[in-house]
Amino acid sequence: MARTKQTARKSTGGKAPRKQLASKAARKAAPATGGVKKPHRYRPPTVALREIRRYQKSTELLIRKLPFQRLVREIAQDFKTDLRFQSSAIGALQEAVEAYLVSLFEDTNLCAIHGKRVTIQPKDMQLARRLRGERS
């Protein structure tokens, strides 16, 4: 709707405005929400882009070390019991796993963009793995 210019008009001699009672004036002066200011929220794309820049800049491991170590030991139990791991071996495994996952998510994102979407879906990951020759 277009804005229109307001022009001054002469009063037509109506009733004079009545004075409000003190309690009514106090009620109107107080905000209806109780004076609680809502915390500032960024729009979702802003936060996502900030996180992307942050993690692309960083070099630290993204998966916590102890949960990853427990997972490796649990998987290794299926193949041979009483296996021992050097801490450097677990570190090397974690580096390799994270590099693989980052690369896979990059390819998955490209598949989603190719499908004219910005949200990755399981079918994008399946396509990325299939194109890599990892899954027939």
Curated annotation (Swiss-Prot):
Region of interest (Disordered), residue spans: 1-45
A single MF term (Gene Ontology): chromatin-protein adaptor activity
Coiled-coil positions: none
Origin: domain of life: Eukaryota
The UniProt record lists the keyword Phosphoprotein: yes
Keyword DNA-binding belongs to the record: yes
Cysteines paired by S-S bonds: none
PTM description: Phosphorylated by ark1 to form H3S10ph in a cell cycle-dependent manner during mitosis and meiosis. H3S10ph is also formed by ssp2, promotes subsequent H3K14ac formation by gcn5, and is required for transcriptional activation through TBP recruitment to the promoters. Dephosphorylation is performed by sds21.
N6-acetyllysine: residues carrying this PTM: 10, 15, 19, 24, 28, 37, 57, 65, 123
Gene Ontology CC, one term: mating-type region heterochromatin
Modified positions (N6,N6,N6-trimethyllysine) in chain numbering: 5, 28, 37, 80
PANTHER family: HISTONE H3
Subunit architecture: The nucleosome is a histone octamer containing two molecules each of H2A, H2B, H3 and H4 assembled in one H3-H4 heterotetramer and two H2A-H2B heterodimers. The octamer wraps approximately 147 bp of DNA.
Primary role: Core component of nucleosome. Nucleosomes wrap and compact DNA into chromatin, limiting DNA accessibility to the cellular machineries which require DNA as a template. Histones thereby play a central role in transcription regulation, DNA repair, DNA replication and chromosomal stability. DNA accessibility is regulated via a complex set of post-translational modifications of histones, also called histone code, and nucleosome remodeling.
Name used for this protein in its record: Histone H3.3
